[in-house]
């Protein structure tokens, strides 16, 4: 049985790697998991997960994309496909593979062949107006995450306005506010994955 692939995208510094680390930490007891990370010229995100996460290092592969990171998750995702296939060969039992994109702009989206589901994450420090810009990553993702809510008072961001703008562009599609450093909002993300991706409660 093929694993479910969840793409995690968003700008540099939004919290993609931390989100993946938290999700694997709190869900790996119930699901066999693996991770592919994308960096332009390094494997820093993979290294972070190996050093700080709960998954064994042979369940994590870092891809060096070079050039534009969005190309590696959409137009030419061959390196990511190869990494996913290698992880499945190493661990035939793997059920969920997270594919973390390199930091990119608001328009970045995953190839539907590479990601069965997608999560797009931004952070409050990037500005209250980010949801209002309506990038394709935010609009088309299955789940939208607005991280670092604790910084809102310091950057003058109104979370109510961000929520309103998000609803305007996403309609009824779900979004979650998080402060991943303190795990705030994380249970909502996990619940969404369990219910909508893993279809818990339907069998």
Swiss-Prot record:
Localisation per UniProt entry: Cytoplasm
Keyword Transmembrane: no
One of the GO biological process terms: urea catabolic process
Superkingdom of origin: Bacteria
CDD domains: UreG
Keyword Nucleus: no
Binding site for GTP: 10-17
Pfam families according to UniProt: cobW
Alphabetic keyword roster: Chaperone, Cytoplasm, GTP-binding, Nickel insertion, Nucleotide-binding
Subunit record text: Homodimer. UreD, UreF and UreG form a complex that acts as a GTP-hydrolysis-dependent molecular chaperone, activating the urease apoprotein by helping to assemble the nickel containing metallocenter of UreC. The UreE protein probably delivers the nickel.
Stored HAMAP family: UreG
NCBIfam families: ureG
Protein name: Urease accessory protein UreG
The organism of origin for this protein: Lachnoclostridium phytofermentans (strain ATCC 700394 / DSM 18823 / ISDg) (Clostridium phytofermentans)
Lineage: Bacteria, Bacillati, Bacillota, Clostridia, Lachnospirales
